[in-house]
Amino acid sequence: MSLPKKQVLYIALELTTDSQNKLKEWFSKQMLNIQATHTNWNEYSTYCHHMTIAFYTEMTQKTYTWCVSHDAEKFKITAKELGISDKAIAVKVDTLCLSENVLKHVTLATNKETKGKPVDSNYITEWQNIEPFELEGVVTFYKKYE
């Protein structure tokens, strides 16, 4: 359910449970190859949860208004590239859903050894094509902690 703008922490295209499970299963298979070629990925946290539409510190009124009018709407997402840095792993996605991120993506994991955070997926520069696959997400509002 949409919230007044001042109460919003972020708005996301939250993956459906089926899509989260599908992405986690796909990622677990990829992780074997990643660990073989990137030796610093031994301890990590898995996410596979959402594509950020906007975080409150950068959210424009236009984006907020769009999200209110599309609240709880489902969107198809196509995963098309895998990105890896020393701090984060993500899939780049195509979707008709709006996002204020330069690159639309879903964070898959962060590296505990390098103190990676989900925001670090915004700074991935190395991407490789993957066999595209479909996911689905729902526009969801997340409230600030008070």
Q: For each of these PLM feature ranges, what is it?
A:
Residues 2-146:
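Histidine-dependent nucleotide/RNA phosphoesterase domain, centered on the 2H-phosphoesterase fold
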